[in-house]
Amino acid sequence: MRFSAIVLTDHSPAVFLQMVRDVEAAGVERLWTYDHLSWRHFRDKPWFAAMPLLAAAAANTSRIRLGPLVATPNFRHPVPLAKEIMTLDQLTGGRIDLGVGAGADGPDATVLGDEKITGRQRADRFHDWVELLVTLLEQETVTATSGSYAAVDARMTPGAANGRGLR
């Protein structure tokens, strides 16, 4: 049996990192942290950004796999997200995982001023977002359009830590 753990980003960075080290010491295989700008009852409480905390976790661990859970098109464009994941993969020596989802209604969906969308629109947007994200993670240079998402001469160098595409 394999174990994964979730450590929320509602803790100070120092506490978050101690929890990450404790989870790794316990032999857990994978650690996720929620990739939200705020979350549920934590909306008016401290909540830190996932990607910088994952970078710090990479520097404080050596074995455990790390990743955001879940990244969504609610506030993430595929180009900067792919660059962040590629960078985290390099920082971890290939120990990065990426959880993705369509995104739900709520603060993450409206914080950038976007209109609420239907479930069908959300599914279509997710398809387009994943299509471009996967292309970016697999290729060194990308010029592509997928629905309302575009990448023009986007560079994903040096790519995956293991020399293969990030899949």
Predicted regions and their residues:
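Internal, glycine-rich beta/alpha segment that forms the wall or movable "lid"
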Residues: 43, 77-167
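N-terminal beta1-alpha1-beta2 module of alpha/beta enzyme domains
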Residues: 1-60, 164-166
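Conserved beta-strand positions in the central sheet of alpha/beta enzyme cores
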Residues: 32-33, 65, 99
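Short, small-residue-enriched loops and turns at beta-alpha junctions
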Residues: 39-41, 73-76
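Active-site beta-loop-alpha junctions enriched in small/polar residues
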Residues: 6-10, 36, 71-73, 101-105
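Alpha-helix-loop-beta-strand connector modules within alpha/beta enzyme cores
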Residues: 44-67, 125-136
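Loop/helix-junction capping segments adjacent to catalytic residues or to phosphate/diphosphate-binding pockets
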Residues: 13-14, 75-78
